[in-house]
């Protein structure tokens, strides 16, 4: 419980004290979005690493060599914890943005920081708005920003670490239309940090592993039609 209180206080202080910086970055983004997001992501990466340290989270990283150095990438992972996002930003060596549920856009200050670090808000109830978000993500990937999706659509709860919900196929259009590689990512044991003993935060060892990139143009057409299912099986086979 002590860790939870310290982390909550740190986040609140950060959001309040960094308001002037946030406003400057939002202003910069009107003229140079890349500069704004680069500075913003460096700040977010730093604060997320501090939070993970306070949480006692030890992160084992594998497969960094599988991340293409040039161009935008579509990262696809399982989703067990709020801490998944912290780990992704802290340790992924790419300019990165997440596709988040639209409900997150209701939180003032958090919403602005998410905008700065290239996050997009997906309204799953409105097809037209959802397609607009996917198109924005495609343009970001084409411009060199990588996008991270959790195609289960929600955090999966339960004790079976190898269990996965169905992967929704729609978001995979980002890679297809942007002609970008898909990098499957495995997040192991992240649910043990917080969700299993809410509101306590437990010091645990977790893993993040980047798998071999998938190039859709190299796959059979039938596999491309079910690319979500194909990617899901690759991740499921490696979950521990």
Predicted feature locations:
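N-terminal membrane-anchoring alpha-helices
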Residues: 1-58
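Catalytic core of membrane glycerolipid acyltransferases/transacylases, capturing the structured
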Residues: 22, 26-42, 54, 69-127
């Amino acid at each position: 419980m002590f860790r939870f209180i310290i982390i909550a206080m740190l986040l609140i202080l950060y959001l309040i004290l960094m308001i002037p910086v946030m406003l400057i970055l939002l202003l910069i983004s009107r003229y140079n979005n890349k500069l704004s997001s680069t500075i913003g992501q460096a700040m977010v990466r730093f604060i997320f690493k501090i939070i993970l340290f306070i949480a006692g989270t030890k992160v084992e990283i594998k497969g960094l060599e599988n991340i293409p150095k040039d161009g935008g990438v579509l990262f696809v992972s399982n989703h067990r914890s709020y801490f998944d996002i912290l780990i992704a930003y802290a340790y992924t060596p790419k300019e990165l943005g997440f596709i988040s549920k639209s409900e997150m856009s209701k939180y003032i200050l958090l919403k602005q920081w998410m905008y700065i670090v290239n996050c997009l808000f997906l309204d799953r109830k409105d097809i037209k708005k959802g397609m607009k978000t996917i198109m924005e993500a495609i343009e970001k990937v084409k411009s060199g920003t990588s996008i991270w999706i959790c195609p289960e659509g929600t955090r999966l709860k339960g004790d079976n670490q190898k269990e996965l919900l169905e992967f929704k196929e729609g978001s995979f259009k980002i890679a297809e239309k942007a002609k970008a590689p898909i990098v499957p990512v495995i997040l192991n044991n992240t649910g043990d940090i917080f969700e299993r003993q809410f509101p306590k935060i437990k010091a645990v060892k977790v893993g993040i592993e980047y798998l071999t990139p998938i190039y859709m143009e190299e796959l059979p057409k039938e596999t491309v039609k079910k690319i979500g299912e194909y990617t899901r099986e690759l991740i499921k086979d490696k979950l521990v």
